[in-house]
Amino acid sequence: MRHRKSGRQLNRNSSHRQAMFRNMASSLVRHEVIKTTVAKAKELRRVVEPLITLAKSDSVANRRLAFARTRDAEVVGKLFNELGPRYQERPGGYTRILKCGLRTGDKAPMAFIELVGRPEDAEAVEADDSAE
């Protein structure tokens, strides 16, 4: 029985899941928006949001924890230099999942997962306001 077992298996073994979410988290931090399946996006939230919360208080210990979870120095730098200060006043809820239809090959439900308040969002809102 699966009682009290949280998280999705996604038909992968644990090392594959860990590597996949490590790579997806790095991609999301680097590009601030990625396209994936809805199930992976929902599970990715559980990986990325604690990383951003960790980045809100910059210390050597927190940087080492973030590096242990991402294994990418560039991503750790962006987390602590850009994302931590950006979300300093926000108490969680750093990601947004937008469903975007079905994948062509297998009809899997797809979604964009993005960081809220990213600079492109602000530019798009300003463009919409000026058009009206």
UniProtKB/Swiss-Prot annotation:
Part of the 50S ribosomal subunit. Contacts protein L32. Disulfide bonds: none annotated. Pfam families: Ribosomal_L17. This is Large ribosomal subunit protein bL17. One of its GO terms (molecular function) is structural constituent of ribosome. Gene3D superfamilies: Ribosomal protein L17. GO terms for biological process: translation. GO terms for cellular component: cytosolic large ribosomal subunit. Keywords: Ribonucleoprotein, Ribosomal protein.
